[in-house]
């Protein structure tokens, strides 16, 4: 057991322009090779494109997209008696948001298109409307959890 005491829980900082934690979480997930300024550029360009497309606050579109993609339940592989079962588990809010952001970025990267800002803005707008690859991923996860409800007691 550690003698130092418990570690303080870290909270995500907010970004300089929108002063929002979700935007900062998005920036940190899109980050590659430590190029944070490029990550900020991509996010802010995507936000501008969302503003032009929908003529609404891009922050509200982002919140709506993340709320739509956030899963309530997921499956976790659990080995019981020589066979592996997919056991459904509930997901907390912070873990759910992290998963949603990861799925949105993965879906954006898969999209055909010119640049990442354009692809990300399109995926966020689609997710806010209730369509898109990230929404399909969430629904597939929920279906998988529903199908394996019989194994819920293995938690």
Curated annotation (Swiss-Prot):
Q: Which GO terms describe its biological process?
A: translation
The answer on whether this UniProt entry bears the keyword Ribonucleoprotein reads: yes
SUPFAM superfamilies assigned: Ribosomal protein S7 (SSF47973)
**Secretion signal, residue range per the UniProt entry:** none
The protein's matches in Gene3D superfamilies, at most eight in alphabetical order, are given as: Ribosomal protein S7 domain (1.10.455.10)
Q: Transmembrane stretches, by residue range?
A: none
This protein's GO cellular component annotations are: chloroplast; small ribosomal subunit
Q: Which UniProt keywords apply?
A: Chloroplast, Plastid, Ribonucleoprotein, Ribosomal protein, RNA-binding, rRNA-binding
> What family is it from?
Belongs to the universal ribosomal protein uS7 family.
What does the subunit section of this Swiss-Prot or TrEMBL entry state? Part of the 30S ribosomal subunit.
Name of the protein in its database record: Small ribosomal subunit protein uS7c
Q: Which organism is it from?
A: Stewartia pseudocamellia (Japanese stewartia)
């Amino acid at each position: 057991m550690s003698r130092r005491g418990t570690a303080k829980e870290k909270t995500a900082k907010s970004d300089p322009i929108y002063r929002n934690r979700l935007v900062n979480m998005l920036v940190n997930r899109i980050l590659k090779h430590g190029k944070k300024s490029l990550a900020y550029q991509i996010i802010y360009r995507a936000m501008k494109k969302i503003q032009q497309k929908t003529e609404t606050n891009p922050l509200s579109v982002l919140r709506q997209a993340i709320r739509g993609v956030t899963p309530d339940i997921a499956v976790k592989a659990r080995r019981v008696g020589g066979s592996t079962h997919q056991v459904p588990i509930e997901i907390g809010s912070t873990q759910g948001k992290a998963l949603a952001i990861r799925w949105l970025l993965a879906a954006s990267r898969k999209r055909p298109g010119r640049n990442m800002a354009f692809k990300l803005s399109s995926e966020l707008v689609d997710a806010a409307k209730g369509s898109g690859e990230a929404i399909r991923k969430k629904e597939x996860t929920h279906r998988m959890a529903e199908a394996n409800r019989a194994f819920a007691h293995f938690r």
